[in-house]
Amino acid sequence: MPRAELTLFAHIAARADGDLDLAQAALLIAEDEYPGLDVAAYIERLDVMGAGARKVLLDLDKPGDRRSQARLECALGFVYRELGFAGNAADYYDPRNSWLNDVLDRKVGIPITLAVVLLEIFARAGVEAAGVSFPGHFLVRSPGPSGPMFVDPFDGRILSREDLRELHGRVAGGPSDPDPRLLEPADKRQVLIRMLHNLRGIFAARGDRLRLRAILERLEILTPSDELRREIVSLGGESPIPPTKSRILN
């Protein structure tokens, strides 16, 4: 039988992507580290931040101008300058950078968790945006007047084409134009899966079997596989999804 704390996560993961609450699911990932985490309190904090961003944008908004670079820059300025969010360059692999509650408390994180903060604040402020599961560095995209604009959530910069070439060069062996498919919007499950893979890598490198198993159990709910089941069992756990049961994702 699955652990009780996985039940709500599995229920949310079974929803259609449009109905999946990204912030809630991301906060539930932290429940293994923080039992009894007050998820609703953190959602309320995002609501307050989103309302603040919406208020800042009111003075800027003009009819037909909701996709301007100036509007996106204003929203980013609110998150990074006024609220004070920043990338944690000093301790990039601190697991607290991957727990959304810690990111909201400490206001530092890595690209993917800062992207979740951006996406949640933007959604509440009326700024259209989506995550981008770019290799090696998660991004955020927002519609612009002449095509999508891309944001580095680590520092809140709007990226130029050359910036994207350099980012792609980190995994391609030299600056080069990324395949357009790498810049497509990521669905919410992809965001959660990538968050879990980051934590998986951290705890595997540390040899932290207990925390690694907890992450793998959540990962298997999103991406069931025999390989994951075997790894969970090898770590002393029980697969949340028995092989005879239907998988949540097809």
Residue ranges and their predicted role:
Residues 1-240, 248-250:
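A structural boundary/capping signal
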